[in-house]
């Protein structure tokens, strides 16, 4: 069995109010490590424009813009994939997971279907996950997808109980092992 190398990252929260230079640095690391596959555990897009908690604060809403959120995310994904040099690299396999911040798009459409539209509305397709990832795992049954690679389970978060809330606690790793009995990696 050949050993595989993975680069796993999560919760990049690309946001128009913050520079995307960090994605250049992560991209350089990715090409330096030259992994077999890369796993993005979700929340790559902050999607502050669809944050329902900010509706109480009008000054927070004014600075938010859906188009800027989408453009910032796609620029970040592009920066991750730029080669730092002309050296030959083997192309890694890119695996992505939908996080709760990306899921804000689907929630907004479910709340008000009139918002949906590929050209003039909001749409999950604007994230271009089919372009950025070889394999992408969307939420299923209102919870993050779980996928196994090389004997390890990956998800944006693992649910605790039947309510779909994220497993948490003082000793999160211990809770994951105790409840899942399996090697697991999550973001959130």
Place the predicted regions along the sequence by residue:
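Conserved catalytic scaffold of divalent metal-dependent phosphoesterases
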Residues: 72-185
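Active-site glycine-centered loops adjacent to acidic/histidine catalytic or metal-binding residues
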Residues: 11, 43, 99, 187-188
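N-terminal active-site segment of His-dependent metallophosphoesterases
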Residues: 1-78
